[in-house]
C-alpha cells in the first residue's frame, strides 16, 4: 500500500510551554479508513490541525504523498487540496448565505471555471444527499445536515484524504449512524478517511484500524481486535470495551462461556458467535 500521509516525531508546544504532542509517528495508507481513539484533551484535534498545515509543529515533520509539508502560501494551498479537514463543529466551517455558495468556496479558490465550480459543488451535495438544500441558508439546517454540508465542502475540492474531527459529536444515534454510513460509503468509493472519536461502540463498525492517543502520544496502533483485547491500553487511554464486548466478557468471566480469542465487538460478530453455541 502507498503511504499518503505521515508524521515523523511530531512535537507541538502551546505558547505557554505545554506539550500537546510528544513525538507522534503516524502513517495513513491510501484507501484506509481509520480512527484516532482517545479521550477529550488527548491531542486528537491538535494532531489533525497539523495534517494540512493549519498548525505548524514545534519540531518534526508532516509528509503528504512522500513530500515534506512546507508552510509558504503556495505549499499550504496545495496541501489543503490534498488533505481536507472537517471540523467538529460545522458552524466553524459554514459561513456563506446559502449551502451551494458554502460548498463552492473551496473550488472557487482553486482557480477553476465557474462552470466547473458549480458542477463540483452540486456533485458533492448530491453525494451527501443535500442537493435539495442548495439554496437554503446553512443556519436553518439541523446538526446532521450541517455536518453533511461541511463534508460536501471538502468533497468539492476532490482531496485524497478526508480528516474528520469527532464527526458524530452532538448528533442523535440515528444521525450519528447516518454520518458514519456516509463516510463508510465514501471510503468504499476510494476516499482515504481518518476520524477522531471517543465513541468505542461506533469504531468497530467502520474502522480498518485504530490509533490510540493518550496525553499527546500514540500508545498503540492495530486492528479493532488487537486494541480491544489489550486491557492495559484500554485502561491507560481511559476507554472501555464496546457494549457488545462487555456482554461477552461477562458471559466469559461469570459463566465460563468462551468464544475464542477476544470478544465480538459488533452485533454481526455477536450473532455469528452465538450461532456456534446453539
From Swiss-Prot:
Record Gene3D superfamilies: P-loop containing nucleotide triphosphate hydrolases
Q: Name one Pfam family in it.
A: ABC_tran
Q: Source organism's superkingdom?
A: Archaea
Positions with a binding annotation for ATP: 38-45
Q: Which UniProt keywords apply?
A: ATP-binding, Cell membrane, Membrane, Nucleotide-binding, Translocase, Transport
One GO MF term: ATP hydrolysis activity
Membrane-topology annotation of the record: Peripheral membrane protein
State the Gene Ontology BP annotations. Answer: cobalt ion transport
> What do the Gene Ontology cellular component annotations say?
ATP-binding cassette (ABC) transporter complex
Q: EC class of this enzyme?
A: translocase
State which residue ranges cross the membrane.
none
Protein's cellular compartments: Cell membrane
InterPro entries, alphabetically?
A: AAA+_ATPase, ABC_transporter-like_ATP-bd, ABC_transporter-like_CS, ABC_transpr_CbiO/EcfA_su, Co_trans_ATP-bd, ECF_ABC_transporter_ATP-bd, P-loop_NTPase
Similarity annotation: Belongs to the ABC transporter superfamily. Energy-coupling factor EcfA family.
Its function, per the record, reads: ATP-binding (A) component of a common energy-coupling factor (ECF) ABC-transporter complex. Unlike classic ABC transporters this ECF transporter provides the energy necessary to transport a number of different substrates.
State how it assembles.
Forms a stable energy-coupling factor (ECF) transporter complex composed of 2 membrane-embedded substrate-binding proteins (S component), 2 ATP-binding proteins (A component) and 2 transmembrane proteins (T component).
Protein name per its UniProtKB record: Energy-coupling factor transporter ATP-binding protein EcfA
Amino acid at each position: 500500500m502507498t503511504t499518503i500521509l505521515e508524521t515523523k516525531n511530531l512535537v507541538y508546544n502551546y505558547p505557554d510551554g505545554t506539550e500537546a504532542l510528544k513525538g507522534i509517528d503516524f502513517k495513513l495508507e491510501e484507501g484506509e479508513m481509520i480512527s484516532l481513539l482517545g479521550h477529550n484533551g488527548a491531542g486528537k484535534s491538535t494532531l489533525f490541525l497539523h495534517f494540512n498545515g493549519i498548525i505548524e509543529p514545534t519540531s518534526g515533520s508532516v509528509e503528504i504523498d512522500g513530500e515534506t509539508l512546507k508552510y509558504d502560501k503556495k505549499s499550504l494551498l496545495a496541501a489543503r487540496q490534498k488533505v481536507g479537514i472537517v471540523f467538529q463543529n460545522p458552524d466553524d466551517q459554514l459561513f456563506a448565505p446559502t449551502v451551494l455558495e458554502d460548498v463552492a468556496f473551496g473550488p472557487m479558490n482553486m482557480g477553476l471555471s465557474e462552470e466547473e465550480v458549480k458542477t463540483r459543488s452540486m456533485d458533492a451535495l448530491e453525494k451527501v444527499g443535500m442537493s435539495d438544500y442548495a439554496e437554503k441558508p446553512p443556519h436553518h439546517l439541523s446538526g446532521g445536515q450541517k455536518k453533511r454540508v461541511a463534508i460536501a465542502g471538502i468533497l468539492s475540492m476532490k482531496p485524497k484524504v478526508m480528516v474528520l474531527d469527532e464527526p458524530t459529536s452532538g448528533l442523535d444515534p440515528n444521525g450519528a449512524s447516518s454520518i458514519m454510513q456516509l463516510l463508510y460509503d465514501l471510503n468504499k468509493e476510494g476516499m482515504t478517511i481518518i476520524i477522531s472519536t471517543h465513541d468505542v461502540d461506533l469504531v468497530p463498525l467502520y474502522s480498518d484500524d485504530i490509533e490510540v492517543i493518550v496525553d499527546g502520544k500514540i500508545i498503540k496502533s492495530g486492528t479493532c481486535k488487537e486494541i480491544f483485547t489489550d486491557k492495559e491500553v484500554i485502561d491507560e487511554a481511559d476507554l472501555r470495551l464496546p457494549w457488545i464486548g462487555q456482554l461477552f466478557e461477562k458471559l466469559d468471566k461469570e459463566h465460563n462461556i468462551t468464544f475464542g480469542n477476544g470478544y465480538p465487538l459488533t452485533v454481526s460478530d455477536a450473532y455469528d458467535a452465538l450461532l456456534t453455541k446453539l
